[in-house]
């Protein structure tokens, strides 16, 4: 009976040790993922900044990702160039206004 208890105790110890290593690996992976997300957040293009060369690197607003809004600019020489900036589209502004108003009313 004593040998069975010793073997069970060893098995429980081995299982808990191996699962704790797995959890540590999982936490390390999550930490690396969070660090990568933080890095991309720092590199994203903020609101009202130019996004002509990188139309997909926009930052997130309160609820939605900003849109890269482009216009054609005609220079004094008559050349047409496309200029883009990050901004919030009107329908996103309206949705944010409604959600903000709802939060104020319903807490």
UniProtKB/Swiss-Prot annotation:
<dbReference type="Pfam" id="PF10530">
    <property type="entry name" value="Toxin_35"/>
</dbReference>
<feature type="disulfide bond">
    <location>
        <begin position="51"/>
        <end position="68"/>
    </location>
</feature>
<comment type="similarity">
    <text>Belongs to the neurotoxin 19 (CSTX) family. 04 (U1-Lctx) subfamily.</text>
</comment>
<feature type="disulfide bond">
    <location>
        <begin position="70"/>
        <end position="84"/>
    </location>
</feature>
<feature type="disulfide bond">
    <location>
        <begin position="44"/>
        <end position="59"/>
    </location>
</feature>
<feature type="propeptide">
    <location>
        <begin position="21"/>
        <end position="41"/>
    </location>
</feature>
<dbReference type="GO" id="GO:0090729">
    <property type="term" value="F:toxin activity"/>
</dbReference>
<keyword id="KW-1015">Disulfide bond</keyword>
<protein>
    <recommendedName>
        <fullName>U1-lycotoxin-Ls1h</fullName>
    </recommendedName>
</protein>
<keyword id="KW-0732">Signal</keyword>
<dbReference type="InterPro" id="IPR019553">
    <property type="entry name" value="Spider_toxin_CSTX_knottin"/>
</dbReference>
<keyword id="KW-0800">Toxin</keyword>
<keyword id="KW-0964">Secreted</keyword>
<feature type="signal peptide">
    <location>
        <begin position="1"/>
        <end position="20"/>
    </location>
</feature>
<dbReference type="GO" id="GO:0005576">
    <property type="term" value="C:extracellular region"/>
</dbReference>
């Amino acid at each position: 009976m004593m040998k069975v208890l010793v073997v069970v105790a060893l098995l429980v110890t081995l299982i808990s040790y191996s699962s704790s290593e797995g959890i540590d690996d999982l936490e390390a992976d999550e930490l690396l993922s969070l660090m990568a997300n933080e890095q991309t957040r720092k590199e994203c293009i903020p609101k009202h900044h130019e996004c002509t060369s990188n139309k997909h690197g926009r930052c997130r607003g309160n609820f939605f990702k900003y849109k890269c809004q482009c216009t054609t600019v005609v220079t004094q020489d008559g050349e047409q160039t496309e200029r883009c900036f990050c901004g919030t589209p009107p329908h996103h502004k309206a949705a944010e206004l409604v959600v903000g108003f709802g939060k104020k009313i319903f807490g």
